[in-house]
Amino acid sequence: MTTGQFTIPLMKRFGYKASFAGGVEATASMGGQIMPPVMGAVAFIMSETIDVPYLEICKAAAIPAILYFITAFMMVHLEAGRAGLVGIPKDECPNPWAAMRLRWYLILPLAILVYLLFAGYTPLFSGMVGLALTVVLIFFGATLSRNFGTRPLQIIFWILIGLAASTFFQYGIQAIIGLALLMAVVLWFAKGGRETLKVALNALADGARHALPVGVIIGVLTLTGTATLFAGYIIDVGKNSIFLSLVLTMLVCLVLGMGIPTIPNYIITSSLAAPALLELGVPLIISHMFVFYFGIMADLTPPVALAAFAAAPIAKESGMKIGLQAMRIAIAGFIIPYMAVYSPALMLQGGTWWDTSYIVFKALIAIALWGGAAIGFWLVPMHWFERLWAFVAAAFLVAALPATDEIGLGLTLALEVWHWLRARRLNPATTA
């Protein structure tokens, strides 16, 4: 909702369809939860649940997240080519460094949060420190800094604010809780402060409401034995075909994600399906990342598609159309978890750097092929059989079966030669 207010109208202004602009925004926004170094809240819960350092979670998520955003970029680029859109002149592009020079201090909470996470502190402690510093900057920093008329004094002030916040490290969580109580007292007597406290209490109430169905669902599934039955069913199916077990797990994540937020979805599915996948030989982090990914993809998947329907009023388009576009744009989010199960090197779980490089190479080619097949454009508009050709070639590259890589690469090379020759006949300038 925050970034969409800016990005969706901007894309529509440059000629993108409203449904496509909404789909891009929904896809990119959900991608923030899987992109290190600061991922979604589920990543912190995962770190605590499986007792794995947050750094390892980030390492496992890095390559898939990059591939996810490459897919989104590829779709936007190909759609621009299909629709004949052009970019704005370079002199009209905004300067991000000017904004950084003006408000550089606002990245202090993020920088400290990342430092603490990679320094080995727990996600809970790191998040609390980052949140405390954010509150200090919002409620005190902006007001006090205006009293300093020169830029050097302002810079010194912000450095002192950061150093003051860092002193909380040696006192632990008690100091942060004390600071929160102190600020609550200050806000109670400050002008407009009681409204702020009301917002904070409403946020806590929302968190409790989101947590309530988790306990109910897990309790019902555990007490009735359904959880054990479901896990056993996944294992039984996996003995004959692990692919079917993965599909079943994916469907459960998507269905649960249609009714509950991502965090409760992960907590439930990680307690049901992840242990079953682990018993079938899927590495620990990958089994949890699998349910994590599809819990996020549920917000892009119709008929519910919460992220798509959130973008609908901004784009002034049907949420269902935006959801269908988002599924097409985020195709990597649906495919990469399967590739990681069959090739753990994609998430840096075993294997050599050559193994990782090779699987990334295959994934990039598959992403490009699926992008062309979905949009219907490469160098020039693609015929229906070329789109089918690209889809089949990508499917062979993703499939973990004997000789599928060779077949997929052969089909890809043949398609590229064919399409290049056709594009050269239609528009020599395109291939010059």
Residue ranges and their predicted role:
Residues M30, A41, I45-T49, L110-Y115, ...:
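Alpha-helical transmembrane segments of multipass membrane proteins
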Residues M1-G32, V38, V42, D51, ...:
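Hydrophobic transmembrane alpha-helices that form the pore/transport pathway of multi-pass ion
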Residues F44-Y54, F118-Y121, F168-Y171, V220-L229, ...:
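Transmembrane helix-loop junctions in multi-pass membrane proteins
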